[in-house]
């Protein structure tokens, strides 16, 4: 229950989801289960309905998601419990539905500078250019997804499994 200001990050996430139209939340819990359940209870004081998918051991991101399968029967949002978001989830859900994809990922364009000069050379070792501490850009996963229930079929039950593996399997199926 990592705090951010006066509230746990999880409470900020639930508030953000509610403001974006989410009415029902399933929290996938494991080792911090008791403190999370005691704090959030059924979710009514947070303006949502909360249910709990429980595992007795850590299962990694997708493995934990698999524990919520019995609660999911339509398009759903999966968010990591240790991040804060400031974008329109409503727009993301609309885009997901228009695209007819099985998974829509939120991405962030991360820019960073290399600490070193980058040297380009020919095969013979002759220097052709020098770029001092160049800036690079890469799209990174920020742990918020809109998914279709069939994605859960790609996740093995009761086994640690990463979301990266689910995304790779989805890409292989071209969905």
Segment roles from a protein language model:
Residues 76-77, 84, 90-97, 111-113, ...:
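Catalytic-core segments of class I nucleotidyltransferases/pyrophosphorylases
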Residues 11, 62, 164:
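Glycine-rich phosphate-binding loop at the start of an alpha helix
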Residues 1-37:
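N-terminal glycine-rich phosphate-binding loop and ensuing alpha1 helix
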Residues 1, 118-121, 167:
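A structural signal for short hydrophobic beta-strand segments in well-ordered beta-sheet cores
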Residues 3, 120, 146-148:
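Short, well-ordered beta-strand micro-motif
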Residues 37-123, 154-156:
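Conserved beta-loop-beta/alpha segment of the NTase-like Rossmann-fold superfamily
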């Amino acid at each position: 229950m990592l705090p951010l200001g006066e509230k746990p990050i999880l409470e900020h996430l639930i508030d953000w989801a509610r403001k974006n139209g989410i009415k029902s939340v399933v929290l996938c819990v494991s080792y911090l289960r008791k403190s999370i359940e005691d704090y959030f209870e059924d979710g009514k004081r947070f303006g949502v309905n909360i249910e709990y998918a429980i595992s007795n051991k850590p299962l990694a991101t997708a493995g934990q998601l698999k524990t919520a399968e019995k609660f999911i029967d339509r398009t759903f949002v999966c968010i990591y419990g240790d991040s804060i978001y400031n974008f329109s989830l409503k727009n993301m859900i609309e885009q997901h539905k228009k695209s007819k994809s099985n998974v829509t990922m939120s991405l962030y364009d991360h820019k960073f500078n290399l600490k070193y000069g980058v040297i380009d050379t020919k095969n013979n070792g002759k220097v052709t250019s020098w770029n001092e501490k160049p800036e690079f850009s890469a799209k990174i996963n920020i742990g918020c997804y809109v998914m279709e229930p069939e994605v859960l079929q790609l996740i093995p039950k009761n086994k640690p499994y990463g979301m990266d593996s689910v995304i790779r399997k989805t890409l292989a199926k071209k969905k």
